[in-house]
Structure formats: structure tokens, C-alpha cells
Amino acid sequence: MPRVMNGCFFSFEGPEGAGKTTMISKLESLLRERGIDVVATREPGGVRIAEAIRSIILNRDYTEMDGRTEALLYAAARRQHLLEKIVPALEAGCVVLCDRFVDSSLAYQGFARGLGIEEVWKINEFAIDGYMPSLTIYFDIDPQIGLERIRRNRGREVNRLDLETLSFHEKVREGYRELARRFADRIVVIDANRPLDDVFAETTAAVLSRLKGR
């Protein structure tokens, strides 16, 4: 059963190189300028234990990692992050901007790894205990464009998922699009192939509209 939250929980999703982190940073600044209490965070990570799990999941040396192991590690990191950071922020009435949440697991492990969206959801349903975003922004991008952005970004360390085949990243995109169809009331799709300013304008409009209506 969905939880009732004092604050407002937004998640931001997309394939590698979709520009989520940039959008969250810009949005955080804009909301703070408007006097809104904001907590920006990321998955996997955000708190000490989850960051330790992140270092395992994304380590380029662990190419032998099994898909189920990967899914379980993400869910474990998510649980700890939720309890330590997201829930306290929501209880304090803050706006939470989270770089990835449960939809990432459904798209990457459930769809692209072939574990099944329903099966991966069961793992995460136990982990999140009813906490779901009020709104999810999905940045849709051509995987080739996204991966090229990563290659050009010298400040970003290449991780294990970046090294997956183009076919894998195309499946991730298919997975996200399937989720957007299933959960159209929660997920807003934004074309991230466009210029940054256009993407940010549409992102801001979607978030402010939801905040105004709560």
C-alpha cells in the first residue's frame, strides 16, 4: 500500500548519458532559490552503506556478476538509502530529488537482463515498503547518443554498466518505455535528445506543476 508523505518525492530515470544528474543539479538550485527545502540524492548510494554497495555494483572488475546478484544488491542499497535519507527528508516535509529509484531496477535487471519486471518488482516491493515517487521523470535518449556523451565527459568515471553492449542499452531503453506505458499516471517522458535548455524547461514545468497540485 502506498505511503502518505509530508514531503514530495521525485525520481529521475533514464539510460546512461541521459543527463539526469545535470537536470537534478539545476532543478535543485532553482527550487532552493524559491525557498523550497530540497534534498538531492542518488542511487545506488546516498548514504554510507549504500555507497559501499555501489562500489561493488559498478566496479569494472566484477564483470562476472550474475543478474540476480545485481538486482539484490541494488535492492539492498535502496532499502538502506530509503531509511536513512529519503524517509527522514519526506517526514520533514522536504522535496526529494532522487537520481534513479526502483524503475532503474525494473528496466536494467527486469527487462534488459531478462529477469522479468514482475520478479524484480517483488524484490523491490519488499525493500521499499510502500514508498514510491509522486512523479517520475524519464529522460528518453538514443543509447548511441547517451554513450557518446559519456565518452566525451572526462570528469565521469566509466563504470561496469557503461561497458555493456549497445544491444543491452537498447533493451534498457525498451524497458523504460514499457514502464512509461504501464505507469503513465506516474511517469512523464521527456525527449532528452534535445538541447539542454529545452529539456530543463520541460522538466521544471512538470515538477512545478506537481508541487502546485499537492
UniProtKB/Swiss-Prot annotation:
Reaction equations catalysed: dTMP + ATP = dTDP + ADP
PROSITE patterns: THYMIDYLATE_KINASE (PS01331)
GO biological process: dTDP biosynthetic process; dTTP biosynthetic process; dUDP biosynthetic process
Taxonomic superkingdom: Bacteria
InterPro entries given in the database record: P-loop_NTPase, Thymidylate_kin-like_dom, Thymidylate_kin_CS, Thymidylate_kinase
Stated role: Phosphorylation of dTMP to form dTDP in both de novo and salvage pathways of dTTP synthesis.
Gene Ontology CC annotations of this record: cytosol
ATP-binding among keywords: yes
This enzyme's EC code(s): 2.7.4.9
Top enzyme class: transferase
Keywords, in A-Z order: ATP-binding, Kinase, Nucleotide biosynthesis, Nucleotide-binding, Transferase
An MF annotation (GO) of this entry: dTMP kinase activity
Name by which UniProt lists this protein: Thymidylate kinase
Residue ranges crossing the lipid bilayer per the database entry: none
UniProt key word Transferase: yes
SUPFAM superfamilies on file: P-loop containing nucleoside triphosphate hydrolases
Family from the record: Belongs to the thymidylate kinase family.
Binding site for ATP: 14-21
